[in-house]
């Protein structure tokens, strides 16, 4: 019985960091292959093959797509990492409002390293999921009460909705 109990305990931390681990891996891989290509160390043919593979990994089908099976942690993590880089280097007014401490700090790698070292998925999503990524993924929140005949769209793309979507996803 102890072995059966210890196996799930071993994998528990991986479930707490899936978006961050997969997002970090795809972001770093994408960054490295682009730098190598820019330096001429990867041919165009190999680059196209790598980008095709990468695109397949980070693909997020829409909720109405037959392939949809939930949010792809690779896609969400990668999008969030890229968005953090954008916020640090080229913020919008909305970014400055939502992320005053990192917007325009011009240190995306420092910001990402801090996030990787100090957050699990729940706190990472609560801290860094931006309205831009929420819109890109077309995220919304449904309230589905079994006794009710219909589902209610309870959080949409507005200030209150962004915060509620972040909280629900975390």
What are these language model-derived features?
Residues 1-8:
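Active-site-adjacent bridging/hinge elements
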Residues 11-22, 66, 70:
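Short, charged/polar micro-motifs that form catalytic or ligand-binding hotspots
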Residues 45-170:
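Non-catalytic terminal regions of proteins
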Residues 11-15, 35-44, 91:
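Inter-helical turn/loop segments and adjacent helix faces that build the functional surface
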Residues 9, 30-34, 85:
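Sec-exported extracytoplasmic/periplasmic mature domains
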Residues 20-33:
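An active-site-proximal "capping" alpha-helix that borders the catalytic cofactor pocket
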């Amino acid at each position: 019985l102890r072995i059966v109990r210890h196996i799930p305990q071993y994998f528990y931390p991986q479930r707490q960091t899936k978006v961050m681990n997969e997002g970090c891996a795809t972001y770093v891989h994408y960054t490295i292959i682009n730098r190598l290509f820019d330096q001429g160390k990867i041919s165009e043919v190999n680059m196209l093959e790598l980008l095709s593979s990468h695109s397949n990994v980070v693909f997020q089908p829409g909720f109405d797509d037959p392939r949809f099976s939930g949010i792809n942690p690779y896609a969400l993590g990668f999008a969030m990492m890229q968005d953090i880089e954008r916020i640090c280097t080229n913020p919008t007014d909305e970014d400055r409002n939502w992320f005053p401490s990192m917007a325009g700090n011009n240190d995306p790698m420092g910001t990402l390293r801090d996030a990787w070292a100090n957050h699990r998925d729940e706190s990472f999503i609560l801290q860094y999921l931006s309205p831009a990524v929420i819109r890109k993924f077309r995220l919304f929140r449904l309230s589905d009460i079994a006794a009710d005949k219909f589902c209610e769209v309870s959080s949409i793309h507005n200030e209150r909705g962004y915060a509620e979507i972040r909280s629900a996803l975390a």
